[in-house]
Design a protein with these regions (language model features):
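Transmembrane helical cores of multi-pass secondary ion antiporters/exchangers
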Residues: 1-324
Length: 324
């Protein structure tokens, strides 16, 4: 019963933040983080610790699939070069640059570990996209940022896994590159296969409700086999969504597409809101753990984080400005 009450309150909080955010000029994800932080410091609220596996396996595949399946086909094809550059090339370049920076700032850290940390902080998230939409930039910029957000998390996680593998074993640079390429290529193949199978099956189902139920399973049908084969489940989910979105107008009825769009918008709202609310709720537990550390170590950590933030902004500016 207690878990049910928490879930209901969380849903109400997500709905309220989404409705109030635009009125107060604050992006809904950022507002949810603030609410989560405030709640985490209430004396009767226990420490919240979320298993990362729940996010990686249960939340991110449908969240990224939802965003990719709703991506406008024409705009995505037109801006594919910019989107792929930002979501793949820029993430890799930023992660490697931060890897060298961390090896210089933190004594004893290896380059592979530095790149792993760089992969964690390089991608943009929903807050950035929400802020950009609100300040009224051109539709092209919004399309590019939304497209970038589809793949940059997946790219960063593949790079993170490869970097962690490099820290745990004696592997060569080309072995790491091979692992990265394998994870992406196999995931793309599975995503394409699942996407076309999804369109084929659902074009033969007449009931809109059954059609929607099938669609909810698609990101997991793409992600789970990919992970079992050592590839990226997130890349597979994104590709399956892109294939579905590109072919839906030709293969699915208007009723099915409308039902799909409404249900996936709801799922995306709930999952994205839960992620940011959870970030805020975890802060109290994180600070409690940090209190056991030396204050000097915490201060050094803040300085390193500030330098890393500046470095990410500089690298992104150097990459983006010539393309404007």
């Amino acid at each position: 019963m207690e878990l049910l009450v928490v879930a209901v309150l969380g849903l109400l909080g997500i709905a309220a933040a989404t409705a109030i955010g635009p009125k107060v000029g604050v992006a809904a994800p950022l507002l949810l983080v603030i609410v989560g932080i405030a709640v985490s410091f209430l004396p009767f609220v226990p420490d919240v610790v979320i298993d990362p596996e729940w996010i990686l396996a249960g939340v991110l595949p449908p969240l990224l699939y939802s965003a990719s399946v709703s991506m406008p086909s024409m705009e995505f094809r037109r801006e594919f070069g910019a989107i792929s550059g930002l979501s793949v090339v820029l993430v890799v370049v930023s992660s490697v640059a931060l890897g060298f920076l961390f090896t210089w700032l933190v004594p004893g850290i290896s380059l592979a570990a530095g790149i792993a940390f760089g992969a964690i902080v390089s991608p943009t998230d929903a807050v950035a996209t929400s802020i950009v939409k609100r300040i009224g930039v051109t539709p092209r910029v919004v399309t590019v940022l939304e497209g970038e957000s589809l793949l940059n998390d997946a790219t960063a996680l593949v790079l993170l896994r490869s970097a962690i593998a490099a820290t745990a074993a004696s592997v060569t640079f080309w072995q790491v590159v091979g692992d990265f390429v394998f994870a992406v290529v196999v995931a793309v193949m599975i995503g394409v296969l699942v996407g076309f199978a999804n369109l084929w099956l659902r074009s033969r189902v007449t009931d809109a409700t059954v059609n929607t139920v099938i669609s909810v399973t698609v990101p997991f049908l793409a992600a789970v086999p990919s992970e079992l084969l050592g590839a990226s489940g997130l890349v597979a989910a994104v590709v399956a969504g892109l294939v579905t979105g590109q072919g839906a107008a030709r293969r699915l009825s208007p009723q099915h597409r409308q039902s799909d769009a409404q249900n996936w918008r709801t799922i995306e709202l709930i999952l994205e809101g839960a992620v940011f609310l959870g970030r805020g709720l975890e802060l109290s537990a994180i600070l409690s753990a940090l209190q056991a550390e030396e204050s000097r170590g915490i201060a050094v950590g803040w300085r390193i984080a500030a330098v890393a933030l500046v470095a990410v902004i500089v690298v992104r500016a150097i990459y983006v400005l010539p393309t404007l």
